[in-house]
């Protein structure tokens, strides 16, 4: 009897106890990030965050990584510092730079508290043992030296700084859209070096994730969402229903279903207020 009791106790002792409030906050941030859809394996719920999803880019294919708390194949051995450095600085625990397909360029704007709450949530989930797959990039993009050079030119790891001239609602929407939901990562066209074109932020991209079109979400009347009201934007993020009754497909449908639809109406409205305030940019996104 004593042996039967000792074994579970030993197992439990190796599982870190997470603060339930941090887990709850982290789950909300996880949803605000779109449910980390890129880290799942399509059609396999058992590995919903264990990586393996191929993400096509103009430079080759990269695979979503295992972000479950498995200690050997996931992030289960990561310290708080490791997690912060990955999310905010794009560096692995081994000191290697991550490819910027991982949107640390946006997550860098998150607060330390929010990043660690997200970690608490991920570490509360069941671990899944699944090895990560190496990227399939062509030369020279398959070298870490090229990543380091890219970072020197295009990465500025600064936190979000509230704009005192704007409302609290606007700042909340800006923080969610820019940092947590990382909308600009998909909806901003890229330069030939794969960096976001800062002069056309949110203006849409023909080279979206998995070869999909990422529409213009600036308030341009003809090529963007200038004809949408804040209510239209909020409703879309809740239901995936466009103002004309159609719906988004592909990855956007996934991030709404796994993430955005679970957010509070006030947060979705804040995102809408922020998007409506952006400079309208004319850019009709078409297939190449």
Task: Give the ranges of each region predicted by the language model.
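Electron-transfer interface patches adjacent to heme c in soluble/periplasmic c-type cytochromes
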Residues: 54-85, 105-113, 200-243, 256-268
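Electrostatic cytochrome c docking/interface patches
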Residues: 9-31, 149-178
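Membrane-embedded segments
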Residues: 81, 90, 95-106, 111-121
């Amino acid at each position: 009897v004593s042996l039967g009791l000792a074994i579970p106790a030993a197992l439990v002792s190796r599982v870190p106890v997470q603060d339930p409030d941090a887990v709850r906050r982290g789950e909300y941030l996880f949803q605000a990030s779109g449910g980390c859809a890129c880290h799942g394996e399509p059609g396999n719920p058992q590995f919903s965050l264990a990586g393996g999803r191929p993400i096509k880019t103009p430079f080759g294919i990269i695979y979503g990584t295992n972000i479950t708390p498995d200690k050997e194949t996931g992030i289960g051995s990561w310290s708080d510092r490791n997690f912060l450095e990955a999310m905010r600085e794009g560096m692995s625990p081994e000191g290697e730079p991550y490819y910027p397909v991982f949107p640390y360029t946006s997550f860098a704007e998150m607060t330390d508290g929010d990043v660690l709450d997200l970690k608490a949530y991920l570490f509360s989930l069941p671990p899944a043992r699944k090895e990560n797959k190496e990227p399939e990039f062509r030369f020279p993009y398959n070298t870490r030296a090229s990543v380091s050079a890219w970072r020197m030119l295009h990465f500025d790891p600064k936190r979000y700084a509230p704009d005192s001239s704007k409302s609290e609602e606007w700042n909340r929407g800006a923080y969610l859209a820019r940092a947590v939901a990382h909308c600009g990562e998909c909806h901003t066209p890229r330069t030939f070096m794969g960096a976001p074109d800062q002069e056309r932020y949110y203006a849409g991209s023909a080279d979206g994730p998995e070869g999909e079109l990422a529409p213009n979400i600036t308030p341009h009347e003809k090529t963007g969402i200038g004809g949408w009201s804040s209510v239209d934007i909020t409703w879309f993020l809740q239901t995936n229903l466009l103002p004309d009754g159609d719906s988004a497909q592909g990855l956007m449908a996934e991030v709404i279903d796994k993430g955005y639809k679970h957010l509070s109406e006030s947060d979705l409205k804040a995102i809408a207020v922020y998007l409506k305030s952006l400079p309208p940019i004319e850019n009709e996104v078409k297939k190449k």
